From Swiss-Prot:
EC numbers on record: 2.3.3.13
Renumbered residue ranges of the record's region Regulatory domain: 392-515
Pathway: Amino-acid biosynthesis; L-leucine biosynthesis; L-leucine from 3-methyl-2-oxobutanoate: step 1/4
Reported function: Catalyzes the condensation of the acetyl group of acetyl-CoA with 3-methyl-2-oxobutanoate (2-ketoisovalerate) to form 3-carboxy-3-hydroxy-4-methylpentanoate (2-isopropylmalate).
Keywords: Amino-acid biosynthesis, Branched-chain amino acid biosynthesis, Cytoplasm, Leucine biosynthesis, Manganese, Metal-binding, Transferase
Pfam families associated with the record: HCS_D2, HMGL-like, LeuA_dimer
UniProt protein name: 2-isopropylmalate synthase
Compartmental location: Cytoplasm
Organism expressing this protein natively: Aliivibrio fischeri (strain MJ11) (Vibrio fischeri)
The protein's required cofactors: Mn(2+)
Residues reported to bind Mn(2+): 14, 202, 204, 238
Length: 515
């Protein structure tokens, strides 16, 4: 029987640090549900002490996710650990992940402590975390550049204090596979109580070595791998979990290990993270890139026609990538829509069937044939909308020629419908001028992207924008068969977020004034 490698996902913590705009609690919960379907063992949901938003995200995810263990990050500081425990206590079982720097440069120049102090702080942190849970992970930050004697000492002390998972991060992506595997092997050889903990690795991709280093560590005895979906993360990113998953599956006989992942959920999870994080996947990315299973060379195509095994070491179906058959039309009922959602693995509490069906009927009337990927796109977009949106687009008309475009709109502002028309340098510019006039918000667009979310001329188009308002970044998404309408929805998504933030700020200010 082969050993299990535990999969620890940090998309919602380390991965989110790379984003231009933070994910909402609702978006994080969507990703957490997808990770649960994928079969991830541990989900690091956030860093609770870092902000009220992160605290609420961790608490909400801990409340809803039942089949993956939820973890919260904390520094080796009592208040951090207390905050993590408070956010996680709604879960049936949870993990606290605490860390401290151990490399010479970090200890001397960042912490400005002696190594004795660092070991003592780490031990105290683990013992404090054990008051809340018997599942404690301890990380030696920048372990890849830590003198091996110091690393062995810290690992032994943390295990003695009660840590049952020891994480060895290559924090700055500095090591190479033989070197990193050697570090893990040395720990097994020199730390006397190493058998009392699972050794984990967390590799960054600054030199493009994160996946290779993680595999080298597994070969040396590590039995937990940390990473993110699509490899997103700070700087050059993290170890790509979809790549780790398929390496361990495809080469399981050679490596002698396995995971509990449901590999046919990989493609869908990757797409969701890409969409919600507004981070497109490069076409030649391993496993999930658009070209990952493409064969354009005549020699390769000839071989594939004769025997797929000539050039295909895994199938598209193994990651859940399959051609969607014609599924639904405007004559399909609610039961049919729900049946397709059930078949795709979505739980009833992940979407509102009434909202989804109403959006489905509108789309089916416009394009006739609705596919599973259309339903998924509609569901994700509906989950981004809030019923209490103050601004809603009721009507849109565009006239565009070779020089300028004219747009007229009707915008519901609370209970009042307002009309506006504007001329712009193209239909989107004209539409945005209308919205700016009616809402009164002065917004700077940092990024504007349009992507196809379906197939054919009548497929759905998605608009994604990053906007700057008073120094804060906001991410907006719009979805429609008309890309102009999608662009308007994306801007209104941002403006409604700003409007809600302004309302919250006003309430807080009134509370301060009444004290």
């Amino acid at each position: 029987m082969s050993d299990q490698v535990i999969i620890f996902d940090t998309t919602l913590r380390d991965g989110e640090q790379a984003l231009s705009a933070s994910l909402t609690v609702k978006e994080k919960l969507q990703i957490a549900y997808a990770l649960e379907r994928l079969g991830v063992d541990v989900i690091e949901a956030g860093f609770p002490v870092s902000s009220p938003g992160d605290f609420e995200s961790v608490r909400t995810i801990a409340q809803h996710i039942k089949n993956s263990r939820i973890c919260g990050l904390s520094r080796a500081v009592a208040k951090d650990i207390d905050a993590a425990a408070e956010a996680l206590k709604v879960a049936e079982a949870f993990r606290i992940h605490t860390f401290i720097s151990t490399s010479t440069v970090h200890v001397q120049d960042k912490l400005r402590r002696s190594y004795d102090d660092v070991v003592e702080m780490g031990v105290k942190a683990v013992k404090h975390a054990r008051k809340y849970t018997d599942d404690v992970e301890f990380s030696c930050e920048d372990a890849g550049r830590t003198p091996i004697d110091n690393l062995c000492r810290m690992v032994e002390a943390a295990i003695n204090a009660g840590a049952n998972t020891i994480n060895i991060p290559d924090t700055v992506g500095y090591t190479v596979p033989g070197e990193f595997g050697g570090i893990v092997q040395t720990l097994f050889n020199r730390v006397p109580n190493i058998d009392k903990a699972i050794i984990s690795v967390h590799c960054h991709d600054d030199l493009g070595m994160s996946v290779a280093n993680s595999i080298a560590a597994v070969q040396a005895g590590a039995r937990q791998v940390e990473g993110t979906i699509n490899g997103i993360g700070e700087r050059a990113g993290n170890c790509s979990l979809e790549e780790i998953a398929m390496i361990l599956k495809t080469r399981s006989e050679y490596l002698g290990v396995h995971t509990n992942l449901k590999h046919d959920e990989i493609h869908r999870t990757s797409k969701l993270v890409s969409q919600l994080c507004n981070m497109p996947i490069q076409s030649n990315k391993a496993i999930v890139g658009a070209n990952a299973f493409s064969h354009s060379s005549g020699i390769h195509q000839d071989g594939m026609l004769k025997n797929k095994n000539t050039y295909e070491i895994m199938t598209p179906e193994s990651i859940g990538l399959k051609n969607q058959a014609l599924n639904l039309t405007s004559r399909s009922g609610r039961a049919a829509v729900k049946s397709h959602m059930d078949e795709m693995g979505y739980k009833e509490d992940e979407y509102n069937l009434d909202t989804l069906y109403a959006d489905f009927v509108k789309l089916a009337d416009r394009k006739g044939q609705v596919f599973d990927y259309d339903l998924e796109a509609l569901m994700h977009f509906a989950n981004l909308r809030d019923e209490d949106d103050f601004y809603k687009l009721n009507y849109l008309s565009v006239q565009s020629g070779s020089v300028m475009a004219t747009t007229s709109i009707k915008l519901l502002c609370g209970d009042e419908e307002k009309c506006e028309a504007a001329v712009g340098n193209g239909p989107v510019d004209a539409l945005y001028q209308c919205i700016y006039k009616l809402t009164g918000y002065d917004i700077v667009l940092d990024k504007f992207d349009l992507t196809a979310k379906g197939e054919g001329e009548d497929g759905l188009g998605q608009a994604d924008i990053i906007a700057n308002y008073k120094g804060r970044k906001y991410h907006g998404t719009g979805l429609a068969t008309d890309i102009i309408e999608a662009s308007g929805q994306a801007l209104l998504h941002v403006i409604n977020s700003i409007h809600r933030a302004d309302q919250i700020a006003e309430i807080k200010q009134k509370k301060v004034e009444t004290v």
